[in-house]
């Protein structure tokens, strides 16, 4: 009769065994699914946006192939891309993808900032203009000062604010070029 092997007992006092991190099978599957979804987002990007993401050559080839495939072949290719992601650090890729996805939100925030600066310029005048030109030295002080005065006069006379819109356009050019 064959002898039974004793089960290996985990020794909690042993420092080598203490450093082992136990990961459940479910957690491994969740991580793999997350990487597969990341791969799917990247596969759905345009060529111009894909060029902005730091990818190595094998991963880029796999993504370009997945863009050409359909149905089941595409699903298998996405699984393969997820597998490739497991072997590399995906944080720079996630950051680049977030920048691409949030570009619209960043532009909206910048436009709101421009509106706020314009309102401040019209309300406070030269003080706000000096602060603005400290931050953006390429601005034309004289032209901005004239537009601010015109906008203030238009507000006092309840006229349509042409200068107000011109200030906005000038600030947009000034602030978006930096």
Swiss-Prot record:
InterPro entries: DarP, DarP_sf. One of its GO terms (molecular function) is ribosome binding. The keyword Transmembrane does not apply. CDD domains: YjgA-like (cd16331). GO terms for biological process: assembly of large subunit precursor of preribosome. It comes from the Bacteria. SUPFAM superfamilies: PSPTO4464-like. It is found in: Cytoplasm. GO terms for cellular component: cytosol. The keyword RNA-binding applies. Keywords: Cytoplasm, Ribosome biogenesis, RNA-binding, rRNA-binding. Gene3D superfamilies: PSPTO4464-like domains. Belongs to the DarP family. NCBIfam families: PRK05255.1-1. Member of a network of 50S ribosomal subunit biogenesis factors which assembles along the 30S-50S interface, preventing incorrect 23S rRNA structures from forming. Promotes peptidyl transferase center (PTC) maturation. This is Dual-action ribosomal maturation protein DarP. It comes from Haemophilus influenzae (strain ATCC 51907 / DSM 11121 / KW20 / Rd). The lineage of its organism: Bacteria, Pseudomonadati, Pseudomonadota, Gammaproteobacteria, Pasteurellales. The gene is darP.
